[in-house]
Structures are given as structure tokens and as C-alpha cells.
């Protein structure tokens, strides 16, 4: 049997995030003082209270697959947090918990985008977003922004980018 990767994989670019993380690790290992903004990894150890919660969950045999959108308990807690801290009123069944924003975004794009559909990405954007769109067969349409405009989308540029092939606009803000 021939050992080969899929055509889909061969069409994708190397993850710029992973490449930057590798470069940062190599520089750090060579003695360079590096602040890596690549992977979104915290620069602190896991707090003791979270470690203990994990240990307690294992000891309580909470070690099985959870519902895809998250457990009812965590979705309820998030709903309460949004209401209390952010003034946002979301019901638990409107909340989905995932392993990260990229996973959620990939789920949405793969669910809604067909080959040839266009997906608008205001720049700057997280480097993986363009590749996620390509995996679905979509066409990334980049709208540049500028520091002078505080990286805000120009409404005219957005309107000009929208056409009959536009399926999504991905707007990501910290």
C-alpha cells in the first residue's frame, strides 16, 4: 500500500502558529530572551484550585465522554457568569463549550461553507482562519484594516466585499 497523505492535506499551508512557536522555542533554547505570542499558552502554571478540581473529578469517576456541547452544569455556570459579569442573557442551551475557538470556528465553517462560497475575514485575523476556510473548499476574502483606523472595518469595504457567493463574515476580537 502506498503511504501518502490526502489531497486536502497537501493543499494546506504549514501552520504559521506552529512555525512561530517552533522558532520561539529554538531562539529561547539558544539563550535569546523571547516573549512568544504564538500559541496562546498561558505564561503561568495551572492554579492549584484547578488542579484539585481535576483530581476530584477523576476520583469521582467523571472520566467519560461528555455531551458534545458541554455538560449541563458548565453551560449553566457560563450562563450565570455572562449574566452576572457581562449583562448578557443566554440560556444554557444557547451555549456550546469546546476545546477552543479554532475548533468551534472549524465546526461552523464546515457546517455552513460549500466549495466556492466566500468567507470574509477582516485583517488582522488569526492565521488559522484562512486555512479553515480552505479546508471547507471556501474562498477567503480578506478585508484590510489599518492601525490609523484602530483596525476597525471600513463599512464601505465590507459592503464592497459582499456578493452572491458570500456565506460568512468571521469577526474575531479579543
Where are these regions (language model features)?
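Glycine-rich, N-terminal phosphate-binding loop of Rossmann-like dinucleotide-binding domains
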Residues: 99, 108, 122-123, 172-173
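Short acidic capping loops at alpha-helix termini that bridge into adjacent secondary structure
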Residues: 90-95, 115-118, 164-165
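Active-site phosphate-binding strand-loop segment of PLP-dependent enzymes
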Residues: 141, 147-174
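CheY-like receiver
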Residues: 23, 108, 157-161
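A short helix-loop-beta submotif of the ANL/AMP-binding
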Residues: 135-141
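N-terminal small-domain helix-loop-helix segment of the aminotransferase-like
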Residues: 2-100, 107
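Conserved PLP-anchoring active-site segment centered on the Schiff-base-forming lysine
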Residues: 111-133
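Structural signature of beta-strand start/N-cap positions in the alpha/beta core
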Residues: 33, 118, 139, 165-168
Amino acid at each position: 500500500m502506498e503511504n501518502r497523505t490526502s489531497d486536502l492535506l497537501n493543499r494546506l499551508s504549514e501552520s504559521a502558529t506552529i512555525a512561530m512557536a517552533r522558532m520561539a522555542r529554538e531562539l529561547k533554547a539558544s539563550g535569546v530572551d523571547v516573549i512568544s505570542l504564538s500559541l496562546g499558552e498561558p505564561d503561568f502554571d495551572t492554579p492549584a484550585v484547578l488542579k484539585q478540581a481535576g483530581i476530584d473529578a477523576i476520583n469521582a469517576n467523571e472520566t467519560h465522554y461528555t455531551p458534545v456541547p458541554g455538560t449541563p452544569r458548565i453551560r449553566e455556570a457560563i450562563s450565570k457568569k455572562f449574566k452576572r459579569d457581562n449583562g448578557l442573557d443566554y440560556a444554557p442551551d444557547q451555549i456550546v463549550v469546546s476545546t477552543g475557538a479554532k475548533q468551534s470556528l472549524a465546526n461552523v465553517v464546515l457546517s455552513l461553507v460549500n466549495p466556492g462560497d466566500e468567507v470574509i475575514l477582516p485583517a488582522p485575523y488569526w492565521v488559522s482562519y484562512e486555512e479553515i476556510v480552505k479546508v471547507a473548499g471556501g474562498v477567503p476574502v480578506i478585508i484590510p484594516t489599518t492601525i490609523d483606523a484602530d483596525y476597525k472595518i471600513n463599512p464601505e469595504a465590507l459592503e464592497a466585499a459582499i456578493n452572491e457567493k458570500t456565506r460568512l463574515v468571521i469577526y474575531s476580537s479579543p
